[in-house]
Each structure stands twice: as structure tokens, then as C-alpha cells.
Amino acid sequence: MRSPAKYVLASSPGFGLLVAMVVFLFPPLACAQGETTSAIIGQVSDETGAVVPNATIRITNRDMGLRRTASSDAAGRFDLPQLKPGNYSVRVEAPGFAPQQNDDVVASLGQKQTVNFTLHVAQSSQTVEVSGEAPLINPANANTSTSLNAPALENLPNPGGDLTYPLQFAAGALINTAGSGNDFVGGTNGYGNVEFNGLPALANGYIVDGLETNDPLTNLNSGLSTNLVLGLNSIAEVTVNTLSYSVDQGRYGASQVNYITKSGTNRFHGNLYELWNGSILNAADYFLNATSETHKPRSNVNHFGGSLGGPIAHDKLFFFFDSEWVRIALPIFSTITVPSPAFQQCVLQQLPQDEKDFYQNMFSLYGNTSGTPLTVLYCPFNSDGTPASGNPRNGNGCANRRGVSHSSDDHEQVQTARIDYNINPNNTAWFRFQADTGVQAAYTDPINPLFNSVSAQPLYSFAAGYTHVFSQKLVNYFNPAFSWYESLFAPSNFQQTLAAFPIVLQGVGGNAPFTTLGGLDNTWLQGRRATRFFINDNLAWSHGNHEFRFGTNTRIFRLNDYDFGEGTVPTVTYTTLQQFINGVASTANETFPQSTNEPFNFLNLDLYAQDTWRLTPKLTWTIGLRDTFNSNPLNPHDQVARLSGAFDSISHDVNQPLNAVIQTGLGNLFAATPAAILQPRTAIAWQFQPDTVLRAGFGVFSDLLPGSIADLIASNPPYVNTFQGGLLGTAGGTAIAPGVPNSAVGATIAANESFAYGFSHGLTGLPPVAITAVPSGKLHAPYFMQWSLGLEHQIGSTASVKAQYVGTRAVDQPYLMQVNGYQTVCQGCFAPLPYMQPADPRFGAVTQFSTGAGSNYSGLQLTAMKRLGHGLQGQINYTWSHCYD
């Protein structure tokens, strides 16, 4: 989904085709129920078809010995909810009938596994054993999902072992989405994420053992040091729910991706693995070999690890441990342009004395300045020392171009430990701890390693689950979780780097040829620290042919945002070689925050109630309501400033001081937010033929705004000010070198001091400042509506086909728009843009944050599956879609 154009929703029809095919070890199909649990349901009848009430059903987890007992009701039904996913034996006993036992029941993640029994009149004490492959379709649930178990995950080709890779095999997936920077708030700036059903990538939820792992700053998947989401070897099963009308599934409308980690069992088990790819296995680039000054950069991937699990006490206490390590050397080839030694001497002879020290220090940072001579406009001489010809002169003695072969080193390691405890038949618990540490080579400079930047990205998380059986009809599952992570980007010794070169110097245009010096120092320090607490609780109550569920998903989130440090290192530009020679800056931009980092608090409280009603043995109706409260993001330091309303609602009188139109000392990002966001959902599943199921549903979903919204709104003046000096700036100053008379950087410092004084004293005529405006009044929460109608048919015992129509509509989606622009063509041209001056000269760029964008999607999704034998299954997905944004 893309943002609308100015004043008009940018709408363009388009058609999409998507075909995906995969062959993997057979996983049981899942229908979404809970995030970390499963269930076994069924009905007991006799040979005449009459139901058998009061039959005793005993289930046993074959791996861990967990046992639970239930009785069939007056209609012969039984329901055992909130089970740990795994392999179970189910035994049924009733007076006058021979016992029956099925040892091949696989209760998958989020699945209600249906197991029906037909009892025979007892003629001996022998137990009847029943078995058979799990059906390819589940007739009791209207949701759409794809499930992969551990053997499937291990054997599925997966570059990098990324946890999110299996998403692309779900119906309706759109791979490798990307968008413009304006899409970032809307979540369509892809980052390798997957989109479903025309909804943005931030509408995907990644849940591991009940712990939401989305990056809270972007709401996208959370790859750390290697930009991979590691931990695949610790996963027992993943379920991708793309049409989930069960309100206990969560808030995410596009997909809810649930993972559960492996557990120890009564038998010791484990594995070891090593994946390696090095330079010796990779061909060199032809053009690198053709150039004597370059060589093939070093490349290496070393991905290894192992796991071990087993019993501590038989049938009682179990452990599992997994360790994963990744070492990566990424090859990098860069082409750089550097000043020649002769040109350096020429510049030093012409510069004013007070700028020579800065330039001498700058030239020393270039190091190797050899290379192929490059012709540059205004260069006065050639590489052989002769004067350049032409008017203006156009010599090749000022700049040398060469290639640089180097590599960046990243490493990451993940340790996962889990304990499972069967306290007694009515109480079970598990605990999982994970530590993910590593260092990312955030930027590798081709000129001087002094400007290299790194990011240490540790993450520590804890999750637990506790199941209590009050009775066979009332079971509660409590699932708290916690995570903390840090992701800060800067050179290893930032102060040393700035002492060596305190600015970033950029040439702009073909006549300013030299490669940027200073790396990405103008973007450092940036990043975040994030602390999150989660409280999930799900109460399941079976009453007759109803199963009621009540629960909560609560997230408490503390974001320490370090992005306010961006721009504090000045960026100085020049546009011609003459400007470089004379030390003249075209622009100099510098940001002045009162603090380089600020905390923000978020609370997301969701409550839900749901009824799954078996109207008949063949027809199931699910109806539920989810209520969401998203707090108004709070800065406890009251360092938020914003306009008194949307930009077009304020007075644009230039004689009105800025402190009369910009509100300061605020804690909340918005004036007000909704107290409740109601999300009703309903669906049916109707098995109108023995091998055919019709599914239909409608639901409303509301996603969270990403934490990056704090970057936008909390970067407003007077707490964060940005000014531009230089020839093209408004603050004045011309010298490239800082700290000298008439310095462009010094002019920005003076402009900031002038603005701070003038703002606090209510003066007018201040230097124009950039600002982000928010909507007037209460923020409209973004939400989605989703509906579907589908048929699924099983062919024999080895194949199935599915066709479904999916429609979505997104409403009140966030977008950004520049609203203080102007045009210089003519009076009345390009209306409503004003001529020759902005609508409000007190401001520079004004970014309006709004939530008025929308989209519509219609798609036909076809899926065919075939069991191939030897544990293999093939699947083909085809999607035809039409999206109107």
C-alpha cells in the first residue's frame, strides 16, 4: 500500500499474479486457534450412528507423558483445549463397548485436531487400535493457515536460515516488497518482508512462544546483527495464519505467524550442523580481474550450531538447549575519486591561512590517492603537469579514480534454553530464555577505516506458559513474556572520529567529483533501546456445543529513541571544483537537539471474547469481539512540541510569534487518541459434503502505529532545530572549514542561538524551521476490513484443492505529505501551490502526518496439495489480484 498524493488519493488499478511452489516434508495442516497451544476435539458414536454420552477420553502426550481426561457430553462431543502441541495417544472407554485407542494423533500449533470414534459392542477385553493419516482438510474452522513442523523446516531450502522465510509459501504472499521513504510510516518500506492480501507489511505479527518479536520501531520483522531472524533450529513448528477470524489470534490483519520452540522429551535428542561458503567457492567478477589495482574481496559465511534436549525427571521435567552461530564476511567493491597529490598542493597554496590546517588534516585522511586520472571541469592542469586546455579549463590532473576491494565482518550468536514441567495432570508450565548477541558492520568506508561504523545488537528475552485445568470444561492458559534489546549505530570511538574530522564533506554533481569524506557520521549516533512486557491470558470454557474464549493481549513498551542525534555532525556540500579550491560551501546543515535521546512509553491493551458454536456436527460458527486501547505515546520528560492543529488549520500570519502557534512542554504525541477500537469478527465452516468444506468470514483489524512516529513528531522545534548555512542556505556563512571566520557551520550555530532566544522571547522574523504537524483533534486509528469465501475439497487421501476469494479494505492508514511547498513558474500555475513563497514563511519544510489513506484489494487464491510419499508433500499456490490504492 502506498501513500496518497497531495490533496488527492493516488489511485491506480493494477493486477498481480503470483505463483509459488514448494515441496517439503509433510506437515499437518493447521487451523488457527491459539498462539502457543493446540486442542483435540471429537465425537463418540456407536455402530448405528447414535452418540455415546459419558464416554471417558484419556489423552497422553507420547513424548512427555502428560495426561488429561475428559468425558463426552450428551451429544457425544469432547473438547480438550489448551494442549501443548505434539504427538498424542487418545483412548476412549464406555460401558458395554470395546475400548478404542488412536496412537497417531498430531495436535499441531493452533489446530483443533478432530478425532472421532465409532465404538463397537464389547465382545472381549481387547482394545481396538485405530490409525490413519491426518486429513488434509479441517472441517471445523474457517481460518486459513499453513503449518510447517520441525522436519519440514529443517529440509526446506532456506537461505540464511531465516525464521521469516517460510511465510512466502502461504497463499496470497507477495515477496520482497519495497516502497519510498514516504511509505515508512505506512509500513510498506519492505525490508525483505512479505505482504498478504494487499495489506502493508506492518500488518504481519511474528509471535514466538507468545512473545511478539516485531521490531517496535518499524513493526516489521526483527533481524539483528546479521539482518537475519535466527533461531530456526530451536523451532518445533510454525503456523502462518493469513485469514484469521478468531479474535484470540491477535490484532494483525495480514498474517499472524506463530512459532513454538522445541522441548525436551523422555528421550535424549539433538543435532549438530555446519553450513559454510567461502571465497574459494565463489567466482570473481570479470571487471575486478580485468583491473590490476583490484582483487576479489574476501567473502565467507560460517553458520553452525547444535541442540540437545531430554529428560531431567521422566514424565515430569525436561530441558532443551539450542546454540546457533553465524560469521559473515560480505564482499564489497567500491569506486572512489580522490584528490591527486598535485591538486592537494595547488589547493593549499590558494587557501586563506586560517583554512589551511583544516585542509591539510583532511588530505591526510585520504591515504592512498593513486588511480586513473579523471577529467574534471575547472581543473587547471593535466596529470602530466601541463596546463589544461579549454575555456573553462578541463584538465585531468586534479582527481584520480580507483577501485577498492574490501569486506565487512558481521557476527551473531543465539542461545535458547527451555524447561518444561508437568506439575500434575491439571497443571503444566514451561520457561524459555533466549540471548541473541552480535556486532553488525553498519558501514564500511572505502577511504579510511576511521569512519567505519558498527552496531552491537544484543537482545534478551524470556517467555513462560502456565496451563491450569479447573475442570474438563474450563481451562486457562497464562503466557507472560519480556524482551529487551539495543541497536545503536556509530563508529567504535565516535569522539576520536570527530576529533579527526568534525564534518561530513559531500560533493554534489558531476563537477564536484570527490567521494564523500566523513562516511555516514552525519547520521550517527542513532538507534534505539526497547523494553517490552507482554501479558497474554486465554480462558477456554466448553458449554454444550459452545466453546467460549475470554482473554487479553497486553503490551507495555518503553522506547529509548536515539535518532535525535542524527544531523548533529554537520553536512557540508560543494557543487564545483572551484568551490572546493576556494573553501566555499554551497550548504551546511546541522541539527541541534536539546537531547540526543528521549524515552517514550506505549501501552497496548486488548481484550476479547469469542464463541465457537457447533450448530450441527457439520456446521461451525465463530463470532467474537476484540477491543483495543492504544495509549497516546508519552514522553515523560515533556519534550514534545507540535502545532496547535493541522498545518492548514493554523494562522499563517507572519507577525504571530512562533511560540504562539507551537505548543511546547507536552508529553503526548497527539492531542487525543481513541479510548476503544472495536473489532468484530465472524466466520463459518460448513462441511456440506464428506470431502468438501465451505468457509466464509468477515473481520475488522487494527494495527499499531510504529514507534518511528516518535522520530517524526518529537523532532519538532524548539526541542530539535535544523538550520542551513552556506551560499544556498538561509543562515549565511561561506567557509567549508568549521571554526574559522565566516564558517557556514558557524552560521548554523549562530542561527540556532538566535532562534532559541527569539522563540523564548516571542520575537518574529526568526530563521524558518522545519516541523511535523499532526491531525487536529482525536487521531483516527488505522484499521482494516477483511472478508473471504472459499471452498476446499479433498481428493482421496493424498490430495486437496482450495479456491478462495479474499477482499480487504484499509481505512485511515498513515501517510506523510509536504504542505509548505511553493512553485516558481508563474502566478496561478500548479494550483494550489503558492507562487514564489511558501504558505507560511515562518517555516521551512512542513511534513503533515495524517491517517486518511486507504486501499482496496480483491484476490483469487488457488492452492493444490499432494502427498508424495516418504514424508514429502508438494504444494502450489497461485494468486490473481487487483489492488486499488
Describe every region a protein language model picked out:
Residues 2-3, 9, 18-149:
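Periplasm-facing N-terminal accessory domains of Gram-negative outer-membrane beta-barrel systems
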Residues 130, 196, 259, 306-310, ...:
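Residues on the lipid-exposed face of transmembrane beta-strands in outer-membrane beta-barrel proteins
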Residues 91, 97-263, 278-282, 287-293, ...:
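Periplasmic N-terminal accessory/gating domains of Gram-negative outer-membrane beta-barrel systems
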Residues 268-272, 319-321, 429-431, 476-480, ...:
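Transmembrane beta-strands of outer-membrane beta-barrel proteins
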Residues 201, 262-264, 313-315, 424-426, ...:
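Outer-membrane beta-barrel channels and translocator barrels
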Residues 163, 497-500, 508-514, 635-679, ...:
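Solvent-exposed loop/turn elements at secondary-structure boundaries
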Residues 192, 253-255, 302-306, 413-417, ...:
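Hydrophobic, lipid-facing positions within transmembrane beta-strands of outer-membrane proteins
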